[in-house]
Amino acid sequence: FNKGQQEVVLNNFYDDEKPIAITLNPSLTPSQNAQKYFSKYQKLTTAVNHVNEQIRQTHAENEYLETIETQIQLSDPQDLEEIKDELSESGYLKRKQSLKNKKKKVSKPHRFRSTDGTSILVGKNNLQNDQLTLKTAKKTDTWLHAKNIPGSHVIIENNNPSEETILEAANIAAYYSKFQNSANVPVDYVAVKQIRKPNGAKPGFVIYEGQK
């Protein structure tokens, strides 16, 4: 096409029977018209990417706050204090400067014993979850979590637990989750060495692979 044209009709790669008519600026050369549309495409692509990133961040934020809500429902007074500390550190809650600067030790997770005597540990808040999974547990221990919903990190202190212990730990993971009152709560379990925490992730958030 040439300078001065107001429109050009091009083939439609998605439908041969419906060619596309593109409006042109007759004062611009073909190259300038093409550059104009390319610049517009780049701006739209950038805008779409920005919106998608905002959606991703909002989704992650909602998941995090759902986790906090679940933990509050299951918490005791000590857990509530740690949840307050976490929310303060994350910028969701304002606390007095003296309390903010005071370094607190993360409380210990709950400990259970399975029928065969195996130790099972449960984090009751995100600070406990991080401490338990990333620092306390051995790489060979077994980690459990309710599948795709907010819940506690559960650790079986054994690299080859019995099926009975896995089932009992799974029941604990289901109880300490958003769906604790549901009759059927799927639970993932995997070796701790398969767990990792992404850079910049919020407390309690981890990713894993190879789950059963």
What is each PLM-predicted segment?
Residues 1-212:
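Extended, highly charged segments
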